[in-house]
Each structure stands twice: as structure tokens, then as C-alpha cells.
């Protein structure tokens, strides 16, 4: 029994290489480096630099102001979400009478196009 184990132990590398009919790409898997190389990322890009910028509003302002009230942008878009058609309709309702003629016509054209598009294609039908 001991001699059989010694034979198998001594010829282990021959047995394992002899029974494989395909290559693993490397002779010894223990020598391979499995640690990935670290990514070179910019830690101060725009997204990371402004992360949590409005977190102190509640602490310093006694929780009276919501961050959406501090965001500067068009009045018809503040604190509101929606697709392009809904956004254009909302803009026409809020500032349509005060728009220049050409801008209002271009907005109406865009609304007509999007209305047809949303009713013909996509999951909105």
C-alpha cells in the first residue's frame, strides 16, 4: 500500500499532465497573478466633486429648504421629471405666451413631431 502511494505521489505531475488533453494556458496555476491592475480614475471629476453638496442644507438650515429649491435652472424644470414631450408641453404652458414667434413655432413643431412619434412607436402606445 505504501509503495503504491509513493509511486502515485512521485508521479503526480506526470499523471495530471497526462490525463489532460487541453491546455490551461499556463503550466502552473499557482504562479499566475489573479489580482487585477488598479484603475486610473480621476477622484475629483465633476460627479465626485459635487457628491453630497446639498447634504448640509438640513443641518445648517433647520430642514426648511429642499435641495430642489436651490438648483438654478428654468422655472418649468425645477423639481420636475418627465420625458421630452411632457417637458415641451410644460414649457409651452408656462412660458408660451412670452416666447418669440419663431421659438414658439419651433416648440409647437417639436411637440407635434413627438406626439406622433410617441403614439406610433415604443411602449407608450
Curated annotation (Swiss-Prot):
Q: Name one GO biological process term.
A: translation
GO MF, any single term = structural constituent of ribosome
Localisation per UniProt entry: Mitochondrion
Q: Which UniProt keywords apply?
A: Mitochondrion, Ribonucleoprotein, Ribosomal protein, Transit peptide
Q: What is its main location?
A: mitochondrion
Q: Where is the transit peptide?
A: 1-29
A GO CC term attached to the entry: mitochondrial large ribosomal subunit
Q: Which Pfam families match?
A: MRP-L51
Q: Which family does it belong to?
A: Belongs to the mitochondrion-specific ribosomal protein mL51 family.
Self-association or partners: how does it assemble? Component of the mitochondrial ribosome large subunit (39S) which comprises a 16S rRNA and about 50 distinct proteins.
Q: What is this protein called?
A: Large ribosomal subunit protein mL51
Per the UniProt record, the lineage of the source organism begins with: Eukaryota, Metazoa, Chordata, Craniata, Vertebrata
